[in-house]
Curated annotation (Swiss-Prot):
GO terms for biological process: bacterial-type flagellum organization; mRNA catabolic process; negative regulation of translational initiation; regulation of bacterial-type flagellum assembly; regulation of carbohydrate metabolic process. It comes from the Bacteria. It comes from Clostridium botulinum (strain Hall / ATCC 3502 / NCTC 13319 / Type A). This is Translational regulator CsrA. Keywords: Bacterial flagellum biogenesis, Cytoplasm, Repressor, RNA-binding, Translation regulation. It is found in: Cytoplasm.
């Protein structure tokens, strides 16, 4: 893991087309601006983890519950 120190207004580059800029520093939080291609999905890690967990739940389907459905 790379750890970088940045001040307000300073940026870092990832590859040729992603720039992350420190916009605001508050007590205990940092606001970042991310300039990246529109085709790139950017998610907060906690949201990503939530989506992954929901996907796991969705694949945990029990086909035996279909036996309770009556057909006409």
């Amino acid at each position: 893991m790379l750890v970088i120190t940045r001040k307000k207004g300073e940026s870092l580059l990832i590859g040729d087309d992603i720039e992350i800029t420190v916009v605001k520093l508050d007590d205990g939080s940092v606001k970042l601006a991310i300039d990246a291609p529109k085709n790139l999905t950017i998610l907060r890690k906690e949201l990503y983890n939530e989506v992954q967990e929901e996907n796991k739940k969705a694949t945990n389907f029990n086909p035996s519950i279909l036996k309770n459905i009556k057909s006409k």
